[in-house]
Amino acid sequence: VGTRIGGDGPDERHRRPEGLDDLTVEALGKLSEALETVERVRGHLYSAHQLTGTADFALDAAVSLFMQAGHTEMAERIQRELIGRNVIPGHWTFQIVEEFDDGYYAEFREVERQARERFAGGRRHLYEAELRGRRRTARPDYSE
């Protein structure tokens, strides 16, 4: 929880440092928005990872049922072509997630952090905090 100064406006940890211009605040806001989008991408990758694993295990039941129904050729094809298959050459989904996390995602987070440190003393969401101040409803219970 940040410390309020003057009762209205952003709390101290969301106030722009003295001398920080509007364009830089907007640029930091866009960089933060981009990172938030990449966070969503990461979540989708984890979803794909988990769903692919779930599908792979469901194939075991399909194979068993095809075998019981006398469709050995189809059961064997599923075993041969699908169960445990790399989703892209040389990679299971966990490897894709790890490479994303250790490469693109890690670098993206680091660049965003460095930009905040360099221009805003590490403060986050300055653009959004100021936007909140401009767009906040006039209701008395929304003054904080």
What does each of the following model-derived ranges do?
Residues 2-68, 72-144:
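C-terminal-biased regions
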